[in-house]
Design a protein with these regions (language model features):
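An N-terminal hydrophobic leader/cap segment in hydrolases
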Residues: 16-61, 68-71
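Active-site glycine-rich loops that stabilize anionic/oxyanionic intermediates
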Residues: 79, 85-90
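Conserved alpha/beta-hydrolase
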Residues: 92, 99-125
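Alpha/beta-hydrolase-fold enzymes
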Residues: 170-260
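Short beta-strand/loop motif that positions the catalytic acidic residue
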Residues: 287, 293-295, 299
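Short alpha-helix in the alpha/beta-hydrolase fold that links the catalytic acid
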Residues: 289, 303-313
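Catalytic active-site module of serine/aspartate enzymes centered on a nucleophile-bearing elbow/loop
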Residues: 318, 323-359
Length: 359
């Protein structure tokens, strides 16, 4: 692919490729339910050529002087633009198949690599530590991305699609910037951390005390209890998906591009996430747009009860979630966008129906 690198405002580097023509999106949702049986063929004949010829990649420099990377695909005569806020550990490279599916339904798509992961700059010496000082750093990066990159290229409706940690970032974003998105989709949103048998108030106190102590002795936030560097567990032991094909492809991408690899979270990240979630739930009255919450029935990564509480509270505030409660995806693990064909196609069908509904 030939790329033209441009120097724009805020030191934006952009790799330009051919836009998707409107005539190209005639994607049948029925195809989504039978893709795994020929997944290697799909990757070689469809996804790889699409990613190489249709996807634009670039970066901008944020207020902390960090390089924030992103990718996008513009669709001619798009019915809207989807901004993807990925989960922890993720970058746009992990979203290749989802980006493809969204464009085939007529949406332009923009994906950000949050700071500290993907191809974006990492703040600690050990690049595999999951760290952020404050979730508002993520939120400000996302706003710069939307303001300086997305909106100059798309003047129509914007939709937020977020996953896991990206859901916590996305929730804080729509609370602080209520007029940017028309609708928001939250997939397995990280609105509650599993503290095990320890009551949450006590766990929060422990997190804060330990984090305070570690900041006295080092500016390199240590791994949270039991944390380690990048560890690609075998499929049989994974907590993310029941799709062996998609899991293996995701891991192969991270092997091919080691800069994407990220390990466990740090005490600093835990403190920042707990504070962000607490603030978000205190400000649910600021959520004004239509929202859909997709919940994985067998999620072992985050706490589903927090999603139930979110929709319950929004209903009391007069802005109920679609279906009034989280939409439970049966037989699905945490990563709905790389799940097996049946739950994944159900997820996409619900998203497309929600976004296309004018009510």
């Amino acid at each position: 692919m030939k790329c033209i690198y441009l120097l724009l405002l805020l030191s934006v580097g952009v790799c330009v490729s051919v836009p998707v023509e409107s005539k190209e999106y005639n994607h049948e949702l029925s195809e989504l339910n039978q893709r795994e049986s020929t997944y290697s063929t799909f990757l070689a004949d469809t996804l790889s050529p699409f990613w190489q010829t249709k996807v634009n990649k670039g970066h901008f420099v944020n207020r902390q002087q960090l390089n924030i990377h992103y990718a996008y695909v513009k669709v001619a005569d798009a019915q809207g633009a989807i901004v993807i806020s990925p989960g922890r550990v993720e970058g746009y490279e992990k979203y290749q198949e989802l980006v493809y599916d969204f464009t085939q339904q007529g949406y332009s798509v923009f994906v950000i690599d949050h700071q500290g992961q993907g191809l974006s700059s990492r703040r600690l010496t050990n690049k595999e530590k999951g760290y952020v000082e404050d979730f508002d750093d993520y939120v400000m990066d996302l706003d710069q991305f939307i303001t300086d990159i997305v909106k100059p290229m798309h003047q129509g409706k914007l939709y937020l699609v977020s996953h896991s940690m990206g859901g916590a970032i996305g929730l804080r974003y729509v609370q602080q910037h209520p007029n940017q998105f028309s609708k928001a989709v939250f997939s397995s949103p990280m609105w509650g951390l599993n503290s095990g048998a320890i009551p949450k108030p006590i766990a929060k106190g422990i997190f804060n005390v330990v984090n305070w102590f570690t900041t006295l002795v080092t500016d390199q936030s240590p791994y949270f209890f039991g944390g380690q560097g990048y560890n690609p567990v075998e499929f049989e032991s994974n907590q993310l998906t029941t799709s062996k094909q998609r899991y293996q492809y995701f891991r192969s991408v991270y092997v091919a591009k080691p800069d994407l690899q990220l390990g466990s979270v740090t005490f600093g990240w835990i403190r920042a996430s707990v504070n962000a979630i607490d603030t978000a739930f205190k400000q649910l009255n600021l959520v004004k747009l239509p929202v859909m919450v997709l919940q994985a029935e067998n999620d072992e990564v985050i706490e589903n009860e927090a999603q139930n509480a979110f929709c319950s509270e929004l209903a009391k505030l007069g802005n109920p979630c679609v279906n009034d409660t989280p939409i439970v995806i049966n037989n699905a693990k945490h990563e709905l966008f790389i799940e097996s064909d049946k739950p994944r196609s159900e997820v996409l069908a619900k998203i497309f129906m929600f976004l296309s509904d004018n009510d």
